Amino acid sequence: MRIDQTIGRLKPGVSTEQAQAEMQAIAARLAQAYPDTNAEITATVVPLRDFWYGKVRRSFWLLLGACGFVLLIACANVANLLMTQATVRERELAVRAALGASQGRLIRQSLSEALLLVSIGCAGGILLGVLGVRVLVSLLPEEILPFFVKIELDGRALIFTLLIAIVTAFIVGLIPALRTASVDLDQSLKEGGKSGIGSRMQRVRGLLIVTEIALAVVLLAGAGLMLRSFTRLQNTSPGFDADNVLHLEINPTYRRQEDYRVEFMSRHYQQLLQQIATVPGVEAVAANSDLPFVGQRPWYRGEFSVEGQSSEEQKLNPVVNYQAVSPDYFRVMQIPLLRGRAFTERDTVGAGAHRDVAIISRQLAERIWPNAEPLGKRVNCNNDGSGCAEIVGIAGDVKHNSLVDEAGYDFYCSAFQSYSKQTHFVARTKGDPMAVAKEIQRAIWQVSPDTGIFNVMPVTRLSANTIWQSRIWGLLFGIFSGIALVLATAGIYGVMAYFVTQRTREIGVRIALGAQWRDILTLVLTSGMFYVAVGLAIGLAGALALTRLMTSLLFEVSPTDPATFGAVAFGVILATLLACYIPARRAAKVDPLVALRYE
């Protein structure tokens, strides 16, 4: 099965569905006209945007949601700070109101202060954003980005940021502004009257803290799952050893029709391999028509048949990945040969050569011959029984598309018995593969001066490029969740510090009446950890529901992984306990004589 891709532009007014229907009709007519070659050929129309971004669209939405969570936590934090400031300045605001300041003027003042704070934060955020985008782009593999994609902060992003800043200023300034507008003049202007911390405002502060903790827990759970998934991916074997292996892709030039004969191509590749093998530092070299992780899918997939099978039995066989490899391929890539033998120099064409031979993967062997020995079986015969390939070896399974995907059914034929172009060369080296890259290129040009060479890189990079999404998403989720935890911890610290400040006199009275430092410590910690417990419970419940949206991003990790959720709960409790302990310890050390005179 050959997979061909074509890019086209639809006429104005033509939908994707209409194009799909027309392509299917064309495929059906071709199948009817040419049943031997087009009987099972189909056509699928996919918008280019979906082709490039379809698999990562959900990831981008999740990242946008994470940004929104961090923004909400920051809003709650700033709102709490402004509420505290408004409470402390309650008498000042009451004096202004008594001197004729209208409620609208007081509200505008509160919103202006919020806008000033948010503007400063927005300016700093844009600067950090510019630096952050540069760092992010530097972490992305060059090969995975389409040529037309540029990641940068353009005018649209800046306008969006400014709009978000204005909305944020309104959100964080609204609650303090309403508090300012509802100042009780009589109570606030009384001699010695304290700025109140009424039960309503205390509940609002508590609600904001609970919200911060809950959102932080959701982000931490997502980051923890991504981290565990990435760790599993890094420890996953692709079926070969990529360390110290260099990859080169070549584009040989054939000028004559005779150049495409198997005999010439076989001799040409043998000369290239022999010349590369002479380069100092090269232990072994091989060629392959389709190296794992280079393309989106195996270059050639097709039907597989066994000698003696009926046509109905052949329909049950899996589609296999066909690859033409040189004799040392399994040695270079260190793909284990489970049974049988590897290819040799005699597995070629011409006098004295072996007849066509093949090596299949363990998974294919177990699928076709679950209770029999595949070695010696003849496969892919012509209708007259000729042209069969004899299975001479069973190799280990190899992942082709990415570390996330399962291994496929692999069928290896000898490169020296195949018409396929072996455009991928791999060389196992004694040290850093890139250290000998230039010498290997010169060796190729000595044999074939007009051969194009590109995609020169270590095979480890090819492997790493398949998990770039997990690496980047995990990094970004980790950064967002870290910021969220710091903000939530700072928020509860601020609230508890204010709690201690407002109740200093009460604490002094308790100490004067015989309360021990442990009692004061318990009082403050209990008040703070109550909010933590409620926020943690809500956050864990929300995480259990929302992390299911990340299922497609995870590898061998459940979206409700108990270990991850347990670690998140422990981390949040530890961080917030420390945030509560600092003001609690200060409260326990209050001098009762000073506290009783505290205003």
Where are these regions (language model features)?
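Mid-to-C-terminal secondary-structure elements
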Residues: 1-61, 134, 267-469, 475
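Membrane-helix entry/capping segments
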Residues: 4, 17-70, 87-90, 132-163, ...
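Alpha-helical transmembrane segments of integral membrane proteins
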Residues: 48-53, 81-108, 112, 132-259, ...
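Hydrophobic transmembrane alpha-helices
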Residues: 65-75, 167-171, 217, 248, ...
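Interfacial "coupling" helices/loops that link adjacent transmembrane helices in transporter permeases
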Residues: 74-118, 490-530, 536, 590
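Small-residue-rich transmembrane alpha-helices
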Residues: 79, 115-185, 225-228, 526-588
